[in-house]
């Protein structure tokens, strides 16, 4: 790129940075860079002196200290060692129960010499040089470094071999004749298992993927040269890989998984044009702003992604900007000269994207101007994700079978091992990309489902929906006084629906009385007025049959009935009741939800531990106010783990760390005491929604809140024992069961607690779901605090049991039920209610 545009902010409010946004191309970045020379003469001298500096990475762009502010956070977690404090698993954290199963993985060995080390040097220049390109050229021109593997980010130099002295001074001369003194000071000798070294390995693999002609978008790498087109929906899929290097137990392994980037073959300009045709011109700019700000776009001329932070309607492509050399050019001329692109619409505005700041960087915000015509929308809209046919078309291309996924991974390994350039890059650093890891897992026994009059062992262990149709639930409250609010065109569907609902209720033990039916006009305000008029203290439940899935119908009803006038509610779409052939299935699901919302219990599994409370905690961001965190807390209040206490708290915090857990836990313990006349002997809390780099904060800030509540509520004679388990549904690991010459998904209940786990943590993987198509993902569990000192077998088996207790699905789910309940609660509040639900509903699963 020959120039760098300097675009100034025009009163734009800084928005939240998107995780996927890459650094801008140098052509349109707002920054001041001093011009410099490319070549220089040099001479070397050596001097020894003490020097202590902060550690930095070999990123090539930012120091590690800077990256911690807005880069990869998962490396920070590697410094949190929890297992050493858990004496019962200090020697061994592996279980022994279950049937052994041979598993292949998507982990590859990264081999290196036994005495391998990495040496990090801090590099200073006198006088200081602003240009990293010039810094690199002057440094690399010295013969002392010419035969060594090296990586330099402008501040830190990484070498595979140690220099003769701790401090080395070099002297260079620029083409202008200026003398520059370069000082290299050894700051760290890094071993392969150090977090800094782990990050360096990831940097090396970023270079390798670049050499394989892949482009980095967010954390993943894609091949735009091999797109998969879905023309009927104007979509393109870029195949690629997610990759991470880390130490698993005693081995350094590369974790690689197949990934796809969904791109729309629709530019922002086309989107704006279509929106203009459908919107009144008086509110077009406002509507356009609401629709586009926050979206991620891709510029295909450089394969970079950006987050749209604003739209500048005052700037057009014909406007001029100043390049790095001081000359001016227009956007039209710039794109023609740089990319041979001719802009067709000279009246379009420009999009504004704010770039991520470096940590402790107080300089002017950097931003880029983007041309809508050249920006392609990424991802899928909520409307698209609700389109069954569209999602099916996407799934047919992306939902790979275990064998299909393995073939893609084998191809990647072959590319890395056979490509001369990538192999040389690895060999330069003494690394070798090795074979795939295979290991032995265990399959824990399937669970029996306990009902009121029957114990069933489902024929298909992951699904017992057929068994539920003819068996009575554990307990239910009769529904005598309730309302149905509907519009006139849905009235004819009510009688057949009620008939089917009573039929289902008769077989499951759920008594359904005749409701009061209220007809209203087809608008959200009419529904809300009818509810306000007819709901009284005797009403047990309100059912609303909605004419469409417009969000304002659902939101206004749920907000009023969850907070202002707390009554359980059930929303059903008219088109759902129109599916006469599926009415029995629809009525069964609705009956189950209504039973739960009235405080009923559907089924149970055998829990050997008595007086056990399980807790689920989840955190997300409010959809309307991104500075508001929504904390969901759900705890069991009986030994059978079938009744729940639910509370949601809104807090204003920058990080997704809860500060309300003490009050939530105290409320749960009080409810438990009210039901059982004693406190629980054990509490196991499952914490979902923990982001990368937050493990230490959870351990040091959230766990003490729970402990404080437990200590204050407990008596001197006996205090509750607490365990805290971090849950992660999204993990890179994939497991494939080896069956002859083919691979298939691992059996339900497969546990992996060795080789693919971390030595510093008490962790395991559990596969608690099945898939007819595609590849199953295991869920990752990390026990960070454990006063209960349960054996690994018992912790793993209990976790699997809890995956059977989610009442909104008659089958096994991927996480323990309290986690999923907490997720459903936070989702409802963050997306629809935007305020704390009334505690009058705390004993009911009103959010299902």
UniProtKB/Swiss-Prot annotation:
CDD domains: PAZ_piwi_like, Piwi_piwi-like_Euk
Pfam families, alphabetized: PAZ (PF02170), Piwi (PF02171), Piwi_N (PF23278)
GO cellular component terms, semicolon-separated: cytoplasm; nucleus; P granule; piP-body
Protein name, as recorded: Piwi-like protein 4
PANTHER family membership: EUKARYOTIC TRANSLATION INITIATION FACTOR 2C (PTHR22891)
Any one of the GO BP annotations: regulation of translation
UniProt KW keywords: Cytoplasm, Developmental protein, Differentiation, Meiosis, Methylation, Nucleus, RNA-binding, RNA-mediated gene silencing, Spermatogenesis, Translation regulation
Record has Ligase as a keyword: no
PAZ domain mapped to chain residues: 267-379
Species of the source: Rattus norvegicus
Localisation: Nucleus; Cytoplasm
Similarity comment: Belongs to the argonaute family. Piwi subfamily.
Gene Ontology molecular functions: molecular adaptor activity; piRNA binding; RNA endonuclease activity
